[in-house]
Amino acid sequence: MAAPGRKINFAAGPAKLPEEVLLKMQEEQLNFNNLGVSVIEMSHRSKEFGALLNETISLIRELMNVPDNFEILFMQGGGTGQFAAIPLNLKGDHEHADYIVTGAWSSKAADEAGKYINVKKVFQPSKPYVTVPDQENWVHDEKAAYLYYCANETVHGIEFTPTAPESHNVPLVADVSSNFMARPFDFKDHGVVFGGAQKNLGAAGLTIVIVRKDLIGKQQAITPSVFSYKEMIANNSLYNTPPTGGIYTTNLVLKWIKSKGGLQAIYELNLQKSGMIYDIIDNSNGFYHCAVDKRYRSIMNVCFRIGGPSGNDELEEKFLKGSIERNMISLKGHRSVGGIRASLYNAISVEETQVLATWMNEFQKLHNTN
């Protein structure tokens, strides 16, 4: 039962947190574990915070089944900070890195990486971003330092499903910011897996970086210490003051995921939620339109237009206004693409998704002239 005044929050990030997590945070805000202080007041060097940090690492390893040859780091700077940290840490003796550009975030990552390493795109990106070109047409180079991809493009609603791209014998680097723990993850061929916590795993300010051990120690001389994987590992993510409140929040979210049955159970719920919305789109006779190739539709960010492929601004404004009247917020699409975007992260329930589905059906009956 939702607390009074709570909205159904479909924001793309920062996003909804499970209510159980928020209530636990409220309960412990003044007095964490009977220590007489809040977590955000504790010394990051204290044994109590050290225990919390190590427990959080263990929960990530357990839930994602992270292999023993990977380290788990807590960093800052968001996913965007990792756009620079990746080439700074992984360049080694290599001259270039390969990038798969399928949307706004992988495009930004390639642009940022170009400051620190030569970037080669395995195919020429074409706009609008609606699909992932067939891999047999990609141009790979086994001399690349790594092959980078964004597992889920939040802005455009494109997700690598059900598996990662072929690595072609170089380490895969995955930005999983917007589908972190939304489904089971296969670490095969991966060298680095990273993401900001603010969509599926907690609050803004914490970046989780999972690094294969054999890739550590290849950082460029200009790498800032706070972005150095080697420094962070040597100091158990305590090289400088970490986002203590963010780590605490993620700890609670991880326990919530575990209580729900783990990643497979969460994945099945996410399939149910996204399927509910995509079914309405596909059966609307064009009233709702999702341009994304069905093979790569995101289960996290459902992007669509109303009134045809290019959208009808008047209809979309009416839809958003009606959504707010029905206690739903943050359904407006990203400013660069427009339309509607329903972000169905782990904390969004099936029941909340059903409220959106009901409104979509009602709205179509009111305004469909076909």
Swiss-Prot record:
The keyword Nucleotide-binding does not apply. Disulfide bonds: none annotated. The modification N6-(pyridoxal phosphate)lysine is found at K199. PROSITE patterns: AA_TRANSFER_CLASS_5. It catalyses: O-phospho-L-serine + 2-oxoglutarate = 3-phosphooxypyruvate + L-glutamate; 4-(phosphooxy)-L-threonine + 2-oxoglutarate = (R)-3-hydroxy-2-oxo-4-phosphooxybutanoate + L-glutamate. L-glutamate binds at R45. Keywords: Amino-acid biosynthesis, Aminotransferase, Pyridoxal phosphate, Serine biosynthesis, Transferase. Pathway: Amino-acid biosynthesis; L-serine biosynthesis; L-serine from 3-phospho-D-glycerate: step 2/3; Cofactor biosynthesis; pyridoxine 5'-phosphate biosynthesis; pyridoxine 5'-phosphate from D-erythrose 4-phosphate: step 3/5. One of its GO terms (biological process) is L-serine biosynthetic process. It holds the Pfam family Aminotran_5. GO terms for cellular component: cytoplasm. GO terms for molecular function: O-phospho-L-serine:2-oxoglutarate aminotransferase activity; pyridoxal phosphate binding. Pyridoxal 5'-phosphate binds at G79, T80, W105, T154, D175, Q198, N240, T241. Binds 1 pyridoxal phosphate per subunit. Its EC number is 2.6.1.52. Its cofactor is pyridoxal 5'-phosphate. Catalyzes the reversible conversion of 3-phosphohydroxypyruvate to phosphoserine and of 3-hydroxy-2-oxo-4-phosphonooxybutanoate to phosphohydroxythreonine. Homodimer. Belongs to the class-V pyridoxal-phosphate-dependent aminotransferase family. SerC subfamily. This is Probable phosphoserine aminotransferase. It comes from Caenorhabditis elegans.
